[in-house]
A protein has these predicted regions:
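Outer-membrane beta-barrel "beta-signal"
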Residues: 61, 189-208, 348-350, 381-392
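Outer-membrane beta-barrel translocator domains and adjoining extracellular loop/strand segments
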Residues: 46-51, 95-98, 131-137, 179-186, ...
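Gram-negative (and chloroplast) outer-membrane scaffold detector with strong preference
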Residues: 78-129, 254-324, 329, 352, ...
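Residues that define the transmembrane beta-barrel architecture of outer-membrane proteins
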Residues: 30, 53-59, 78, 97-103, ...
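Solvent-exposed loop/turn segments connecting transmembrane beta-strands
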Residues: 48-55, 76, 90-100, 113, ...
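Transmembrane beta-strands of outer-membrane beta-barrel pores
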Residues: 38-44, 65-67, 86-92, 123-129, ...
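Membrane-embedded beta-strand positions of outer-membrane beta-barrel proteins
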Residues: 34-38, 82-84, 119-123, 153-155, ...
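Short loop/turn motifs that connect adjacent beta-strands in outer-membrane beta-barrel proteins
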Residues: 23-31, 69-79, 111-117, 160-165, ...
């Protein structure tokens, strides 16, 4: 899992570094506006016998830069702040939950010109010092290994304190998971209230009229993916082998406004873990390879930031025979959660278009795409996926 967490972190940092590289035009150059934040809240209990948490306290140093219009997409997202937040987290149980250090690339967007609320989202990595251990820490089902993803979603308000400083206050949710690549993987979900202080400058935002004349065209994506996971439930089959899976996706891209793309398509996947289970348990007498595949139709939205984008897709299984057969064999098919997971699947991902023109907004047709995705069935992580595709 360490290599996959590092690859996701590298992609996020690549986005930050690319967008923050020096601009020759001083009028639109990004300005450094750091902040310090404190978050206090509760760790949502995942299972009845997990280690008890008295509280959750997280301290953050946010190294952010305010954009002023060096790229055309900046004004479409109300001139966001881009940067990284360094996190120290304590979970109120030093013996079994310990502490974590996180490094989260973030994107911060203001609500509107006349409002003082802001939204912040970030995807990064964290190292935990007390993960699951079969001998010394057998009940920490939250975190299965030292390295995981760490994400933050914040809604907060700002109040001026002076010409140079702002007071931040609001609510945040932190999530950590390894994408089912190492079990157990219940994941940590922490709900917090936060307060902080940030610096500010008073430069002028630059608006470009070029956004008004760009007309994006519809395209069709063909994408290949390589996934990885451990086979089993969230807390069962600990220590098993990792399995690859192979994914073929086809979908239509329809530009939406000037910063988004609507998606509708189909994904077919082959799971080597399914095939191994079918053979070892003699689950079927024939068509073992066919029954190790799944078929999904989905709809999604892609938020485009220059050469980068964030995708969210919601899908419906049309073909998922192995999962249903396995749950019936285990005697758990009657559970509502299992029935929902047999029909719903979702993906989120970060994408990079290496040859896309920097200020072409949501014109994706004729471009190569590389991406990393997390896939879940309902809310239970399923796998981590590397992708490469082309928009025709």
């Amino acid at each position: 899992m360490k290599s996959r967490v590092i690859s996701m972190l590298f992609c996020c940092l690549f986005f930050v570094g690319y967008e923050l590289k020096g601009q020759k035009d001083s009028l639109t150059a990004n300005s450094f506006e750091p902040s310090l934040n404190a978050y206090g809240g509760v760790l949502i209990k995942a299972y009845p016998d997990v280690p008890h948490s008295n509280h959750a306290l997280l301290l953050g140093a946010s190294l952010t830069w305010q954009t002023y219009g060096a790229d055309n997409w900046h004004q479409l997202y109300r001139f966001p702040k881009i940067g990284v937040e360094l996190i120290f987290a304590d979970f109120g149980n030093p013996q079994f939950l310990g502490q974590a250090i996180g490094f989260i690339p973030t994107l911060e967007i203001k609500g509107s010109a006349k409002k003082h609320w802001r939204f912040k989202a970030g995807f990064g990595a964290a190292r935990y010092n007390k993960p699951y251990d079969v001998v010394s820490n057998p009940k920490n089902f939250y975190i299965g290994g030292h390295f995981t993803n760490m994400s933050i979603f914040s809604l907060f308000w700002q109040k001026p304190l002076s010409e140079k400083f702002l007071l931040n206050y609001g609510v945040s949710v932190f999530h950590s998971s390894n994408g089912h690549t190492t079990l157990p993987n219940a994941g940590m979900n922490i709900v917090t209230a936060g307060i902080g202080i940030s610096s500010r400058k008073h430069n002028t935002f630059h608006y470009s009229k070029a956004n008004q004349v760009i007309s994006a065209k519809r395209g069709y994506m063909l994408k290949f993916g390589l996934g990885f996971h451990e086979f089993g439930a969230t807390t069962k089959a600990v220590g098993g082998p990792g399995y690859p899976s192979y994914h073929l996706s086809v979908w239509m891209n329809k530009p939406f406004r000037r910063s988004g793309v609507l998606q509708a398509g189909f994904v077919m996947a082959y799971y080597t873990s399914f095939y191994d289970y079918i053979i070892s348990q003699q689950l079927y007498d024939s068509q073992e390879h066919m029954r190790s595949t799944t078929g999904v139709v989905f709809a999604g939205h892609e938020f485009v930031f220059g050469k980068f984008s964030f995708s969210a897709q919601a899908g419906l299984y049309l073909y998922n025979p192995f999962y249903i057969k396995q749950k019936k064999k285990e005697g758990t098919w009657h559970q509502l959660g299992n029935k929902l997971e047999a029909f719903n699947t979702n993906r989120i991902g970060l994408n990079y278009y290496p040859f896309k023109k920097r200020n072409s907004l949501n014109q994706l047709k004729g471009n190569l795409q590389m991406g990393i995705y997390l896939k879940a069935n309902v809310a239970q992580a399923d796998l981590f996926e590397y992708c490469v595709g082309y928009v025709f």
